[in-house]
Amino acid sequence: GKNLNTFSFDFVNNHKYFKSNAFQPSEDRPWVDKMVDHAKTDHRYLECDNENMIENLYKAVDARDLPCMADVESSMLYFCSKVVKYNKVTLTGECADEIFGGYPWFHKEECFKAEIFPWSMDMQPRKMLLNDDIIQKVDLESYARTAYQKTINETPKLYGEDRIEARRRQISYLNLRWFMVTLMDRMDRTSMHCGLEARV
């Protein structure tokens, strides 16, 4: 039989500058090494530098059809362009955090209890991107609260669930209906722009 091709993505000198944070508490590389050792795959460690990201910024906008998450999408586009040289179809780890509760809002108490989208608890950074005229015409907080409450109301309920488990289900549903949709669209558009069929 043939060994499975696997790929991991990292940034040049990440090992030198990595700082633990809520979204990425540890580097990926040690875990990748364990997976490769266990599964005996034909693994390629792909790295991206600043020049690669800059070169792919406009391509990332083209792939998405609108301005996007800048370095996140340009680096993904770069990595997809490398993977497609070996495989035309690939399985990704995209959406694993939504399914398995990998985000900080599944665990941090203030996020878990917040009655708003846990990834948008502070709207100020988003409002800074908008013109003052738009901010006056559009009540972002009200829109977010309404969309949040509508999604909470449609969250499936399980008989006999305690309050904590019911809230965990709500957080999961918010992720599936909102956060994950953004990531799936990004993955689909970025990979297909490179001719790579990515499955989540």
Where are the regions a protein language model picked out?
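PAPS-dependent sulfotransferase catalytic domain
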Residues: Y173-D185
